[in-house]
């Protein structure tokens, strides 16, 4: 049965959340954009469950939600434009596609040697990463072909008891999904225009639409 917990966490609820994270279970949680579905990014068990829940093909690796602590452990880059984008828009609704550290578990990249990463401004997400001491899988909370959930109620209706915990009580600040920038092309390429506009990004570095 799915557990519903409100944020900010009370002490006993925080213990429940910590336990669920450590047991490699699946959570639905609010971000500054839409609701996310995730759990321990290093756990193949969690990834496999989320692929099954979302009915998503396994050749599409999940984006990760991180904090700056995890960025250099997960990704490799040597380009000041990436640093400029990070300084300008993180934490916030910008996802960057970067080269991955070759030592990462294979399920994170599906042999693509790349990662999509975002440092969310959501206090909920940042607290979950802190409690688990690992980055989170951070895919949108919807089954393939279904609308993306933007509330705890929508998550409950769409997923029933397929997720272990739903966190509610945090108001999103953006009405769009995150903007995705591929930093592996020249010039960088915008794969999805979302909460951060092409114009805003072009103020920092040249982007191909």
Positions of predicted regions on the chain:
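Active-site-adjacent structural elements in enzyme catalytic cores
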Residues: 1-209
